[in-house]
């Protein structure tokens, strides 16, 4: 699975783009901040390929 920070895989989620290719569920308003290397306090979720 490839990560894509521009498009989340489900509503309210976006690619955290870390080495584990995890999507992190956060409010959409947080997407820009977190996708540009901000701190990530949200619990990570694994999404299937």
Curated annotation (Swiss-Prot):
Region annotation Disordered: where it falls in the sequence: 28-49
Keyword Secreted set for record: yes
Pro residues bias spans: 40-49
Cell location: Secreted
Primary location: secreted
Processing after translation: Contains 4 disulfide bonds.
Protein name: Turripeptide OL47
């Amino acid at each position: 699975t490839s990560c894509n920070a521009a498009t989340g895989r489900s509503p309210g989620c976006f690619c955290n783009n870390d080495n584990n290719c995890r999507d992190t569920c956060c409010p959409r308003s947080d997407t820009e901040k977190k996708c540009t290397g901000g701190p990530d306090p949200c619990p990570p979720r694994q999404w299937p390929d």
